[in-house]
Amino acid sequence: MSADTAASAPSSTTAIGGLGDHQASVSVPNSGHWWSRLLAFLGPGYMVSVGYMDPGNWATDLAGGSQFGYLLLSVILLSNLMAIVLQGLSARLGIATGLDLAQACRARYPRGVNLALWGICELAIIACDLAEVIGTAIALKLLFGIPLTMGAIITAVDVVLVLLLMNRGFRALEAFVIALLLIIFACFGIQIALAAPPIAAVLGGFIPRAQVVTDPQALYLAIGIIGATVMPHNLYLHSSIVQTRAYPRTDVGRKSALRWAVTDSTVALMFALFINASILILAAAVFHAQGRTDVQEIEQAHALLAPMLGVGLASTLFAVALLASGINSTVTATLAGQIVMEGFLQLRLPPWIRRLLTRGIAIVPVVIVTWLYGEAGTARLLVLSQVVLSMQLPFAVIPLVRFVSDRQLMGALVAPAWLVRIAWVIAAVIVCLNLKLLWDTALH
């Protein structure tokens, strides 16, 4: 199958996919300055990056920073580099074939395998949504005094926001997401400046150490960070939304589109690296440095920030960034859920039904755990959701790497051998870390 055939053959399938009318809806200039083409492709990478700084990251980063200082910064860096490689492969698949990852699985695997992969991916989305419900509910409580249980229920109405944005076009959706990302960036930039962490200690934290693997608690948090950073549904999402660009569906056009799409996602994920590292650095500089190694809950961190930093604004900025993170994650998770369901099952539900169904499943355990165990229970549930996400990663990564290394499917954009080897190493690292976690859990 040639590259042209690979991309054109599935057009009918893609037309009924998760993008609907948004496919090839964003124009791309064929001439002019390079920055005009870069701006045209700017967007999908930032939507994907939302998943790399959602409320689930906050819990694992806060726990890691307060308990182990700057030690786990190396894990954040590693997971971010892994994300850059995997998201680049995801964009490559979508641009080369015109299929998203879910559609490629449906085309290549037996029905039973597809149903299993779909079920696993839906569990990942629910785990992600669980983190968003908890994070947004906590932010509403911190800012407005709304009880956690009520805040969790209120999050169900976010479907209205998603529908309004989608009706205004894909660029409006991207602009909204980027605006909230800038708010998060500004909030943490100010907080880091207030905390004034020691530069040498921060830089030293990016150097990997054996303690990350030998200490079971550090490993548990490390896997949680990887699960919170490299999210399974993001691989499905990215392979779909890169197709919103109206680039020429030719070999030359696809190669150019891939270059700009990878640039977009790489820059966006470096942005996410700053946010994730900032959360951990803040916890290490403010809590760990003063002997508070027990800070694992977002509410606890919020309460301690102002008195320990001596600036009341710090806690408010923390809560505002958390709310922006929760809202942003809602938008992208809704889109990812639609893409996954339609790609695997060819089942198209109205977005509001799809969103209420997923959010309803996520709200129930939050309400029950909050009622039975209080706020401490929701904090543990938040970290657990990120470990669950990490356990499901191989089921998205392995099919992706197999597809992008298949010349018959990918044509001229087949991934080079060196890139495939790196991707398999990443897949092996994820699998080994998960097996180590299961072993330690069984022993303890």
Swiss-Prot record:
Keywords: Cell inner membrane, Cell membrane, Ion transport, Membrane, Symport, Transmembrane, Transmembrane helix, Transport
Pfam families: Nramp (PF01566)
GO MF assignments: cadmium ion transmembrane transporter activity; manganese ion transmembrane transporter activity; metal ion binding; symporter activity
Location (main, coarse): membrane
Membrane topology: Multi-pass membrane protein
Membrane-traversing stretches: 38-58, 68-88, 115-135, 146-166, 175-195, 218-238, 267-287, 303-323, 356-376, 381-401, 413-433
Subcellular location: Cell inner membrane
Any one of the GO BP annotations: iron ion transmembrane transport
One GO cellular component term: plasma membrane
Family as reported in the entry's similarity comment: Belongs to the NRAMP family.
Known role: H(+)-stimulated, divalent metal cation uptake system.
UniProt name for this protein: Divalent metal cation transporter MntH
